[in-house]
Every structure is written in structure tokens, then in C-alpha cells.
Design a protein with these regions (language model features):
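Conserved Helicase C-terminal RecA-like lobe
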Residues: 22-26, 32-33, 40, 47, ...
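Inter-lobe coupling linker of SF2 helicases/translocases
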Residues: 100-105, 111-115, 135-145, 168-270, ...
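SF2 helicase motor core recognition
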Residues: 108-110, 159-160, 314-316, 352-370, ...
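Conserved helicase ATPase motor motifs in RecA-like P-loop NTPase domains
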Residues: 146-159
């Protein structure tokens, strides 16, 4: 296997960390998505065989990890610990160089992976253990190993405390994180970005749109209903002396307003179901959908990825497009994901891949696409960066163009889209501070001012 120069640098750095006599043996591999972190890790495993290696990953990429190890180091024996018929014998782990295991198995009552001492533990997409109160975090902390690696492009997934949790897994305490962040960054974190390597540039653009009058009318209705409901809930919460008792209900109201901005039919269907009424079809226009379709039509010689929040909007887009369309959403099996990916990569240049953000942010290598559309902004900038990284990665031959479609609001009815983008900026600032990567502040363009979660809740002036 021939590595790129930045990958050789990464492998050498990791081997130095594993042989270090000072501090924890391991650290953070935080390369930006798409720079080949897996290839670097497999090379380290191959060059420093020191007992069995445990690789813990999201369930959706267990098979991909197994395949990548076979591809990059066929001499390594790989054992997949997953499925109904998985082994109950911990000694099986010691008979293989690498064991790949999903995070879900860490939460068993007596996890089998706790029964042996591993040479190395790798947590891929390590933000999965960011909650220190979760069973996943507590179980991961109990895994015994000589070397410990955290692998993620987003060590600050929601807040800086996420990073504190990941440091704890490595063996770095909270006080050290608070007092010695710069030292930790220099010694224990390696991060390279695509701008510094031979990957074509990625262009980001927020496309701000005015809603059509009929959309504005529906949004005003949804906003006003949410505002009234939230005000009433806040009064009840205050009377009970419990300010958080209606948090989920408040978020549901926020979601309804958001649905109008994604695709109005979602809101109409949701209200009909709630009121047990007959569903009516949305007959109005959608500026966001029209802009999406027009933009796709302007680039018939490039493959396109469309990232959506809701399956309902995916259904509409799939119905309207006349080009070849492929799809991954939260209901897709592992086999379906793999077949859709393979078919898209073989498909004509005008093909479109519809991907639900929560289902397609990990484990997909789609360098054949060079146009990306995000129909609704995500709460977390890291989620969007992961999605974009599916095509803007090592092996990409074209420049990648990313467009995020955002509806504008007004003083009376503020835009949910704009509020989420503002929140992204706040989180991007935290990313930049922890990773020492100023580029992250502008990688996902947003408004100039940030917005806290409490301010998001107050968007309805309730």
C-alpha cells in the first residue's frame, strides 16, 4: 500500500506516541474528513504488533472497516464481533490481530471486550462516547489497553465538554484540559486539512432565499402556533418550579416550524396526523425546491449529493427528478447502503444520491460526486462537515461545490434556518479553539453573530 505524504507523517507521529515514555501512549487522530485516517491506522497496527487491537466503530461501518483492513493489510487477521451469533468466548479476540466491534456492544451488562487486556484500542467516530454519563463512555473507560486512540474529525461535537470526555479516555484529566489545552494540542493531537494536501478545493456557499408568499403564510401560521404553545408551556413549567419539564415539547414546536422551511407538506401531514384529519396536498410553490432542481439541471455532467433532514422531503425530490436517483435513509439495511453506493459510483454523470443526514454522515466514500446540496442546516456543524467529507476526500479529482439552502425570515417571524446557522458559528468557534484550526471558523459560512441554545428557545419570544 502506497501512502500519501501526509499519511506517512501521520503514521510516524502515531508510532512515536505509542513508543513515548512520557504521558499517555496514544492520542487524537483528528484529520479532516476524507484524508484517509483508516489507512494510517491500519498501517500503525501492521507496523507495531503489540497484542490484539480492538477497533470500536458505529454499526453502519463495521463491514467497511473489515474491508479496509483486508485492502490495506491483507496479512492481518480480522475478527468481526457483532451479530446475533457472535462469540461468547473472549479468548477468540486473542487469536486475531484486529477485532472490529460496534459501539452498541459496549452497553451490554457484561461486555466481552472487558475480559482481556488489549494491545491497542481505537475509537473511530469517537464522539459516540462524548457523554460522560452514558453507558458507552463508562464501558469504554473500562477497556484495558496499552495504547488508546481517539479518531474523529469533530472532537467538539456539541460543546467543549465533549473534548474533556475524549481526553479522559486517553488518560488526560479535566484539570489538565482546562489548564494546558495548548500543550495537549501540541503533544496529543494531529490534524491535517485538505487545503494543505493535494485535494481539489471545496467551495462553500450559503444560498439565502426569500419564501414565496404562500410559504410565508404557512410559516407564519406554524410560527404563531408554536409561539403560543411555548408561552403556555413556560407558564406551566414556572408554576411547577421545573424549567425543563417541557423541553421535548418545545423542541417539537421548533421542529414543526422547521418542517415548513424544509418542505411544507411535512408540516401539513404532521398537523393532519396530530388532529386526526384527512391529509391535504401542498399545492403551493417552494422556492427552496425550485432552486435545488434548477441548480442540478445546470450541471448535467457532474454527480450530485443531496443531504436532507426528513424522509418526506426526500420522497418529494425523488419523485420530481427525472435523472437516475439513489437513496440512503434511516431505514436502509447495511446491505442496501452498500448496494446503493456501488450502483451510484457506476451510474451516469447526471445521477443524484439522496442521503438523510443522520444515516449518511459516516462510512460512505463517494468521490465520484462533486456537487453537494444541504436542504436544511443541521444543529451541529460537525454533522455537515462529515456529510461533505463523503465526497471531498482523498481520491477526489474535481473541485467540490457545496450549497446550503437557507430561508430568510423577518422581524416578526424569524427564520429557523438562520437561527440554526447562527448556532453553527458558535460551535465552529469552539472547534477552532480546541483544534487550533482557524479555518474552521469560516469553513461552514454563517452569520457574524452566534446564538446559544437558550436563545434558540427564545426565538419564539416565549
Amino acid at each position: 500500500m502506497e501512502l500519501y505524504p501526509h499519511q506517512i507523517e501521520g503514521v510516524n507521529w502515531m508510532l512515536e506516541r505509542e513508543h513515548s515514555s512520557l504521558g499517555p501512549k496514544g492520542g487524537f487522530l483528528c484529520d479532516e474528513m476524507g484524508l484517509g485516517k483508516t489507512a494510517q491506522l491500519v498501517t500503525v497496527i501492521k507496523r507495531n504488533k503489540t497484542g490484539p487491537t480492538l477497533v470500536v466503530v458505529p454499526k453502519s461501518i463495521v463491514t467497511q472497516w473489515k474491508n479496509e483492513i483486508h485492502k490495506f493489510a491483507p496479512e492481518l487477521s480480522v475478527f468481526v464481533y457483532d451479530g446475533i451469533k457472535r462469540t461468547r468466548d473472549a479468548s477468540e479476540f486473542q487469536r486475531h490481530d484486529v477485532t472490529v466491534c460496534p459501539y452498541s456492544l459496549l452497553t451490554e451488562d457484561t461486555p466481552l471486550v472487558h475480559r482481556i487486556e488489549w494491545g491497542r484500542v481505537i475509537l473511530d467516530e469517537a464522539h459516540e462516547i462524548r457523554n460522560r454519563r452514558s453507558k458507552r463512555f463508562k464501558s469504554a473507560m473500562k477497556i484495558e489497553s496499552t495504547y488508546r486512540w481517539v479518531v474523529t474529525g469533530t472532537p467538539v461535537f456539541n460543546e467543549v465538554d465533549d473534548f474533556v470526555s475524549l481526553c479522559a479516555f486517553i488518560g488526560i484529566g479535566r484539570v489538565d484540559v482546562q489548564c494546558n489545552l495548548e500543550t495537549i494540542r501540541e503533544k496529543f493531537i494531529i490534524r491535517r486539512t485538505k487545503n494543505k494536501d493535494s485535494i481539489p478545493e471545496c467551495h462553500f456557499e450559503n444560498v439565502e432565499l426569500e419564501m414565496y408568499p404562500e410559504e410565508k403564510t404557512l410559516y407564519a401560521q406554524a410560527f404563531s402556533e408554536a409561539q403560543e404553545m411555548i408561552r403556555e408551556m413556560m407558564k406551566r413549567a414556572k408554576a411547577h418550579g421545573n424549567s425543563t419539564m417541557y423541553n421535548m415539547d418545545i423542541l417539537e414546536q421548533f421542529l414543526r416550524a422547521r418542517q415548513v422551511m424544509a418542505w411544507p407538506q411535512l408540516y401539513i401531514d404532521g398537523m393532519a396526523k396530530k388532529l386526526d384529519e384527512e391529509m391535504n396536498a401542498w399545492t403551493g410553490r417552494s422556492k427552496k425546491m425550485e432552486t435545488l432542481f434548477e441548480s442540478i439541471a445546470q450541471h448535467p455532467d457532474e454527480k450530485t449529493l443531496i443531504f436532507c433532514q426528513f424522509k418526506g422531503e426526500m420522497n418529494y425530490i425523488q419523485e420530481k427528478l427525472t435523472c437516475p436517483v439513489f437513496r440512503i435513509d434511516g431505514t436502509c439495511s447495511k446491505e442496501r447502503r452498500e448496494s446503493q453506493l456501488a450502483e451510484f459510483n457506476r451510474a451516469p454523470q447526471n445521477s443524484v444520491f439522496l442521503i438523510q443526514v443522520k444515516a449518511g454522515g459516516q462510512g460512505l466514500n463517494i468521490q465520484s460526486a462533486s456537487r453537494v446540496y444541504i436542504t436544511s442546516p443541521s444543529w451541529n456543524p460537525g454533522t455537515e462537515l462529515q456529510a461533505i467529507g463523503r465526497c471531498h476526500r482523498t481520491g477526489q479529482k474535481r473541485e467540490v461545490y457545496v450549497k446550503k439552502l437557507i430561508y430568510k425570515g423577518d422581524e416578526k417571524y424569524p427564520s429557523v434556518d438562520e437561527s440554526i446557522v447562527a448556532l453553527q458559528v458558535t460551535k465552529s468557534m469552539e472547534y477552532a479553539r480546541v483544534l487550533g484550526d482557524e479555518r474552521l471558523k469560516t469553513q461552514l459560512p454563517g452569520k457574524s453573530e452566534g446564538l446559544s441554545i437558550s436563545e434558540i428557545r427564545n426565538i419564539f419570544r416565549a
